[in-house]
Amino acid sequence: MSGQKNAPLNVAIYCRVGFSEYALEIQKQRAAAVIREHDDWNLATIYTDFGTGPQFNRRPSFKMMMADCRKGLIDKILVRSISTLARDTWSCMKVLRELSALGVTIRFLDENVDTETDSQWMEFLNFYSALSAIWREEIGAAETSDIVPVIQ
């Protein structure tokens, strides 16, 4: 042991919001607070996509974040929720596998899942994203059905 300290982790924050500046600030503040809890974490940058929808090709900040990960500039990403990253299981797992291959870990704050420390993260995320997809389909079906709720 040489007594040298490891270099701090370069941690990025990824936020995606519809159009609410307030929701964005809450996401940023919450993730920044997590970074401050770790002396060996350095805030690298904050990537923010507004009202871009679930497709990755419509998210310029997401694409920039992935490019920075491929360049080795990011060690860890903090995201509010799995659904902030991806809305379907296949897309979520594709991104997580690429990040894992690059040595980049990701921490989902709402679900309290960290790919660095949770050995069962892939199984959990598969299950969670599948449930989220079913939930979104149910909501979409209810919104487009001919059933009109009765309000009393």
Go through the PLM ranges and name each one.
Residues M1-I151:
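Short, structured surface patches at the beginning of a domain
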